[in-house]
Amino acid sequence: MTKIHFGFIMPADQLDKTKRSTYVEDLNRALKLISGQFESIWIIDHLQSGNEDMLEGFTTLTYIAALHPQFKFGHTVLCQSFRNPALVAKMGGTLQFLSGGRFILGIGAGWNEEEYRSYGYDFPPGRVRVEQLEEALQIIKSMWTEERGTFEGRYYRIREAFCEPKPTPLPPIMVGAFGPKMLHLTAQYADWWNVSSTSVERYRRLVRDFERACLDVGRDPAQIRRSWGGGCVCAPTREAAKTIGGDRYNAENSDDDFDFVGTPELIIEQMRPFIDLGVDYFMLDCGGFPNLTTLELLVGEVLPALNA
């Protein structure tokens, strides 16, 4: 039987002007609750979302990794446009070295035009962003595995780039992918394939496309871990779960806007079809602070039942 793993997507936005001490106390309470049960901590990588407070992803995750050595950690997912790929390789290698091998490199092509424009980044068409991501992955892999990395691409280039200490072991590379080109890229370069807030009906179609992409590049689909990331609100009753989740979580799910919302029994029922399709890792955004009901029920009832 495949073991099911949970990861916690820590709140990075909607802080509601929370004082630092309150936020850190709430976060520490949550991490203490899931320690030994959840395997990992994750954070989104966005710079802004309207007028909401937003923590920067790499800085925050480095802080968390230093304080909580019992967890693996990663992003859901890094926007490749925000940082030069050679710098990402260097930062990731450093984190892997200092953390003792706990870093997972989650990365994607980027999508939020608002934050690109606001922070002065060019926002090229999706095709270009996917091509940039492919070059970024080649550079990162080169710098992690070769004595000195050299790469000449259309968008990025490095020459004799020296990245020491080398990350050991190599961090798994997780790519968030839905479209045909991204699925092909994932099949070629990734160790993990991640989807976010996707219904099981849509996921079933994506799995067919993903497995076809793997065969096209000569790779066994079973070599690539399948993960799902998104919202989860769990409570003793479905009505209570809707109240806790509020407008932030979608209780009336659709193909591309899906969250787990309901009682422990319902959450288990919703997760099992994904597990049957090969998912063994769920990264869950669990409703923010200060309400920890979801985490308590996931630890006490849902995860044990899935691994029974």
What are these regions (language model features)?
Residues I9-V24, L78-P85, P167-F178, N253-E265:
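Active-site mouth loops of central-metabolism enzymes
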Residues F6-M10, I41-I43, F73-H75, F103-I107, ...:
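Hydrophobic faces of well-ordered beta-strands that scaffold small-molecule active sites
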Residues K32-G36, L61-Q70, G92, Q96-R102, ...:
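Acidic (Asp/Glu)-rich catalytic clusters
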Residues M1-T18, Q70, W111-Y119, E152-L170, ...:
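N-terminal small/glycine-rich loop or linker at the start of catalytic domains
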Residues M1-L67, F71, P171, D285:
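N-terminal beta1-alpha1-beta2 module of alpha/beta enzyme domains
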Residues M54-H75, Q132-I139, L295-A308:
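Alpha-helix-loop-beta-strand connector modules within alpha/beta enzyme cores
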Residues R20-I34, V88-M91, G176-L185, F260-P273:
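Short, acidic/polar
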Residues T2-I4, N84-Y189, R204-Q223:
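Internal, glycine-rich beta/alpha segment that forms the wall or movable "lid"
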